[in-house]
Amino acid sequence: MSLRPGLLLAAGLAATAPAATRDRDPLSEFTGRVAGAPVRCLNADRAGSLQAVDDRTLIYRESSRRIWRNDLPDVCPGLDDDSILVFEVFGGGPCKGDTFRAVRRGSGIPGPMCRLGSFVPYVKVKP
């Protein structure tokens, strides 16, 4: 099977999340959740929903019950909650070690290449 690089775009928080979600700190959503075992990859259909929180953290909201967090192995200069993420994916979906660039909305100029870490699921604890 030949692996050809593909590009995936992930719009920033302002374009994808409901207003109530945009108005609060995304990291506060981890309160009351328990971290699961890290995984290397997400399904391809989840990549478009990855959201930058700061220069080291991406999140994906799978459902009201499960949120995925990706702590990048290094700081990604220029990455923030208004970034458009452009991924270079080899295979089915974003995986640990895959690279991406952050593009400032309106500028079109990509930032430096950054790498993904492992994806950690956080599941809401049932009362």
Where are these regions (language model features)?
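Bacterial N-terminal signal peptides that target proteins for export
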Residues: 1-7
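Amphipathic, hydrophobic secondary-structure cores in small proteins
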Residues: 68-77
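Helix-rich interaction surfaces within compact, conserved domain-sized segments
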Residues: 76-127
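A generic structural signal for short, solvent-exposed coil/turn residues
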Residues: 11, 33-34, 50-52, 62, ...
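Hydrophobic h-region of N-terminal signal peptides that target proteins for export
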Residues: 10-19
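N-terminal secretory signal peptides
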Residues: 20-69
